[in-house]
């Protein structure tokens, strides 16, 4: 069921790209074909192989993140991609799925003494390592997705809740330090979100233009390829970060409603699986529960953050909208996550 709604969302995304950039449309079309072929291939294999090798995949992608940080393709001051000429590979997107798989395995081990604070520290370090690498790329948006996934899985695992309290307290203490560790443009984006009038032609420009673009679409939109804000480049990043704003300009609130509806139906599908596995008290049932919960957290948080950016109700963090934003790594990672659902 989820793959059907994913396909419908992908069609919306393709039409949106067709109205903006034909070259990107054809590239995304190829990415989607590869992604859906990969989805059915992985479905035929099943999640068991990836579960028993989750430790290997965790360290493999840690190595990928480190290599990306050192020799990755730099775009606007960020090193998030490995350039393979025909494809820019963003390891942090794919790693989300394997990070969830890794946590769902380690948090359900019967021989792991969660009453030991040392074991909790080990689990925390398994989160902190990729979080810091991604944060330093810098990619604050994806780093926050990893944080939400980790907090959610810890909350619903058998880890004593007092440790969760320690973790939340530590986060609150580190937030002021994090402010000074951020890049200047990241701090400016947050300040511009709080008060857009501080710099309407600078850091707040993208957010303001996104809101204008959504409003200009009205109910039925301007029509395919007839958008002005997007096609005339008043709206930057109109095929990636702000693809939803571009889509609403072309297809109106009517089109935007169906996009939100399809996302909601995917979330409901995964949530039903999550609830079903919650009541299975076997070790495999709890692994499946945590994996489904992690994927749900990943999809919901990424969708809400991107939509919030487009509507001007959340700071800009460079998060893509699954199936709608242009990008091979993003769409393939989401399909990977769906393919490994039990």
List PLM regions with ranges.
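Hydrophobic alpha-helical transmembrane segments of multi-pass inner membrane proteins, especially
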Residues: 3-11, 15-206, 245-311
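Phosphate/oxyanion-binding loops and surfaces in catalytic or ligand/nucleic-acid-binding neighborhoods
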Residues: 14, 217, 338
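A juxtamembrane structural motif centered on a specific transmembrane helix
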Residues: 17, 287, 301-342
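Proline- and acidic/polar-enriched loop/turn elements at helix boundaries
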Residues: 21, 166, 225-226, 260, ...
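Glycine/serine-rich anion-binding loops at beta->alpha junctions
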Residues: 86-95, 136-138, 142, 218, ...
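Nucleotide phosphate-binding site architecture
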Residues: 108, 220, 314
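Interfacial segments of multi-pass membrane proteins
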Residues: 144, 150-163, 228-255, 319-337
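TM-adjacent membrane-interface loops and short helices in multi-pass inner/ER membrane proteins
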Residues: 192, 196-240, 251-255
């Amino acid at each position: 069921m989820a793959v059907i709604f994913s396909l419908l969302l992908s069609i919306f995304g393709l039409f949106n790209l067709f109205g903006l950039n034909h070259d990107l449309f054809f590239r995304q079309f190829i990415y989607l074909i590869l992604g859906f072929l990969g989805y059915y291939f992985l479905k035929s294999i099943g999640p068991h192989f990836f579960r028993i090798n989750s430790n290997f995949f965790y360290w493999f992608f840690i190595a990928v993140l480190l290599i990306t940080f050192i020799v990755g393709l730099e775009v606007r001051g960020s090193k998030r991609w490995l350039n393979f000429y025909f494809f820019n590979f963003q390891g942090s997107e794919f790693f989300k799925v394997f990070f969830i798989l890794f946590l769902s395995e380690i948090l359900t081990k019967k021989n792991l003494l969660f009453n030991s604070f040392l074991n909790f520290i080990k689990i925390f370090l398994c989160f902190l390592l990729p979080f810091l690498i991604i944060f330093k790329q810098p990619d604050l948006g994806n780093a926050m997705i990893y944080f939400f996934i980790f907090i959610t899985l810890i909350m619903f695992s058998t880890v004593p809740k007092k440790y969760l309290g320690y973790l939340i307290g530590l986060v609150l203490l580190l937030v002021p330090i994090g402010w000074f560790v951020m890049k200047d443009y990241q701090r400016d984006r947050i300040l511009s979100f709080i008060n857009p009038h501080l710099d309407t032609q600078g850091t707040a420009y993208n957010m303001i233009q996104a809101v204008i673009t959504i409003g200009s679409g009205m109910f039925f939109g301007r029509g395919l390829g007839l958008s002005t804000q997007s096609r005339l480049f008043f709206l930057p990043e109109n095929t990636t970060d702000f693809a939803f704003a571009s889509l609403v300009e072309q297809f109106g609130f009517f089109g935007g409603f169906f996009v939100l509806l399809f996302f909601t139906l995917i979330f409901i599908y995964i949530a039903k699986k999550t609830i079903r596995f919650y009541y299975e008290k076997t070790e495999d049932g709890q692994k499946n529960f945590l994996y489904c919960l992690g994927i749900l957290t990943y999809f919901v948080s990424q969708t809400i953050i991107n939509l919030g950016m487009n509507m001007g109700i959340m700071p800009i963090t460079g998060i893509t909208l699954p199936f709608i934003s242009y990008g091979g790594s993003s769409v393939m990672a989401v399909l990977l996550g769906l393919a490994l659902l039990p």
